[in-house]
């Protein structure tokens, strides 16, 4: 069957396992696609949705509570090459102050398209106003999520699944190049000790509050039908 895809995009959502996916398969995929004259879009800049015809999209979602905790821990430690914030508030205070930014963060990435590279959808200190003012359109967001070719749940981020995803993606592009994933190497999930400790310290009330704050993220995260299933490949 003739392949209709002419570009590849990793829709990388902050603190959702994108670094792991990049290290496992995406960087290698980029090189293979380039050698086969297939264009690709580098999603490491958290670009949001890209409305491109015949675009092959890969993405991953994370438990909304763990994602929010990880976002705070990353920000608290200065992020990537950033200054460590002064007068750091507690986690729950930070969440309350940044509700417009942090709530349903994953869904927003399917409704947002980054246009200004001097601003970003990641750091509350310099966040893109376009991200903060997104009007949530559940139907549109869910429709776009269903259009993702390979959507992985955080619990699927392992060697076996990534190996299958790599095979599927190359097959979908009608590419027969070989690839290699070192299953002995510990690929970076970019999860810090402080993030894990903070999550483990949350009360049930905290967790319930965060799931409710991220109600649409929670709905799609726990919807098993949207995720990649190796049995279908």
Which residues are covered by each model-predicted region?
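Membrane-interface amphipathic segments in extracytoplasmic regions
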Residues: 1-233
């Amino acid at each position: 069957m003739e392949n209709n895809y002419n570009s590849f995009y990793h829709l990388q959502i902050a603190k959702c396992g994108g670094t792991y996916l990049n290290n496992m398969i995406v960087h290698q995929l980029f090189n293979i696609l380039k050698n086969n004259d297939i264009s690709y879009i580098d999603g490491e800049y958290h670009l949001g949705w890209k409305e491109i015809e015949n675009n092959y999209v890969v993405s991953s979602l994370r438990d909304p509570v763990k994602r929010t905790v990880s976002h705070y821990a990353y920000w608290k430690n200065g992020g990537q090459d950033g200054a460590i914030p002064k007068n750091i508030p507690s986690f729950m205070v930070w969440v309350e102050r940044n509700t417009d930014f942090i709530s349903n963060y994953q869904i927003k990435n399917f409704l947002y398209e980054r246009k200004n590279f001097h601003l970003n959808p990641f750091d509350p200190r310099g966040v893109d106003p376009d991200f903060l003012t997104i009007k949530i359109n559940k139907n549109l967001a869910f429709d776009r999520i269903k259009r993702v070719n390979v959507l992985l749940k955080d619990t699927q981020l392992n060697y076996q699944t990534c190996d299958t995803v790599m095979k599927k993606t190359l097959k979908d592009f009608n590419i027969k190049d070989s690839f290699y994933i070192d299953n002995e190497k510990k690929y970076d999930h970019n999860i810090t000790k402080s993030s894990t400790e903070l999550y483990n310290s949350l009360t049930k009330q905290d967790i319930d509050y965060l799931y409710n704050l991220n109600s649409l993220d929670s709905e799609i995260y726990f919807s098993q039908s949207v995720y990649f299933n190796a049995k279908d490949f």
